[in-house]
Amino acid sequence: MSRMRMGKVMAGVLAAALGAGAAVVEPKNTDEILTNPGMGICHFYYSSRIWAYGAASEPGDTLDWMPGTSVIYMRLPWCYLEPEEGVFRWDILDSKARPWIAAGKKIAFRISCMDPTLCSIPDWAIRAGIRGSESHYRDNPKNALIFEPVWDDPVLIEKVTNFYRAFAARYDGNPDVAFVDLGSFGLYGEGHAPKLRRIREEDPAEYDRLCHLHLDLLRKALPRTYLVVSEDIAGGGWIETDASAIGTTPNPFTPGGKPRLYDHPILAYARSIGYGLRDDSIMCNAQRPWASDHFGRLFARETPVVIESGHLSKRLQTKSWRPELLRKCIEEYHASYISTHGFPEIYWKTNKDVWSDFANRLGYRFELRRVEYPDTVKVSEKVSVKSTWVNVGVAPQYANASLTWNLLNEKGVVCWSVTDPKFGFRSLPPKLEDGEKPVEVVSPCTFGYTAPVPNNGNDAILNWCIQNNQDDPGKTVALLKPGVYTLAVSVGRNDGKPEIALPLEGGVGRVYPVGRISVVE
């Protein structure tokens, strides 16, 4: 990094002496919409349809023009991916995922066994003996016939398990996968269907057993993957109960009405085996735009929450879409992801005026408010860098990223890197109703390393260097040369690799300059 560029970066920074050899910097945070792991806006490329909502997109378009879009989400019926038993069309997924992965973004999936527009279970699997029945969607003879299986049919469980095994061989523990939804149970994977509704009403214990069966199937198949389940599997957040019941919460859209269940046994079980929550979907009802925010807050204590908007075209048609509510919904769910359920151009056009308003509250967002450090240090001297951080997002950073302080030379090359051995960003509380919670971090740092060169005559390489007067290290070796460096901050892995974008100016490769520091012998 050139001196001129560094000067421009530091122009908006307050720096003052704090006694001899100490400096304080108060960086100016920007309002840039960031793209970060473990959070962000999800593009609905396949929405239970092979053609919507991404088929019209240009190849390679990763929607950088929709800032904060970090995930391509693909929800497809099983029949597309296994048209013959044991013959898989992974190329339908991988061809669309490749550009996103190359751009440093993530992928997410839901593979369903029941959808309203076609038979989602492959024909060969039904011929193998899966029991079930056909009915017209929503009992309308004009709608397509759809097949609802017997949800614990042994052949269904066998074939789904085999598919999961093949799917897991490619995607379980894959670092490019953000999450996988449960899709094998109910219409869309949401736990409801004509016969399932009757079972839930007439025999709740049997319905719970079926839920557990399918939750366990996916969990067993993908033990190293973040799994997500729709809140509809528990009936959604609309369930009301008596005010005297234990464990209730108010209903914000029906003041004075019955309160909602605070938790649900099925969701509690899902949490116990590591599932996160997804709301399918918000703003489908003009009077009650959402109902499961209380479930979202429960899950958000430990896992990222996903909210999904209703199909935008339908919401615009019914006049239930209210862009100004996106931020409020994110705040009430403590959401980390939001899925844009519609054609991206229409979604952007409809919501661009509120985009930064909601995107900069989604998930986590780390602001560096203050840095105090010695402006001159000796090589190998133990010093401290004191920094103050605020998470102005609505959710924690669940992966617990690490804090690293770097020294850059005039070319912007990292010459030294020290990662705080204790502090993790999971401990940084999000900004909720009770306001910001700044956290001061004192990072122990040692810049450089000097050591004597052992010379007992047995080192043939050292002897050659001395005899040929070439690359002779002398009596000591210093791994960091004295000089003036740029102190820079980064957030990421505990080995120092930067991964998290910060709202700071002048960053290159997610390493951000803070100030100048001199290293002396």
Stretches found by the model and what they are:
Residues M1-M10:
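Bacterial N-terminal signal peptides that target proteins for export
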Residues L14, L18-G19:
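Hydrophobic core
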Residues V24-L156, F295-E331, A335-K349:
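N-terminal substrate-binding region of glycoside hydrolase catalytic domains
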Residues I72, W100, F167, V180, ...:
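Conserved, mostly hydrophobic/aromatic
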Residues S135-L156, T161-E201:
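Active-site groove signature of glycoside hydrolases
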Residues S184-L217, A221, V228-F299:
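Substrate-binding cleft/loops of secretory-pathway carbohydrate-active enzymes
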Residues T248-E372:
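Substrate-binding cleft of secreted/luminal carbohydrate-active enzymes
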Residues A359-E521:
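Extracellular/luminal regions of secreted and cell-surface proteins that mediate adhesion/ECM remodeling
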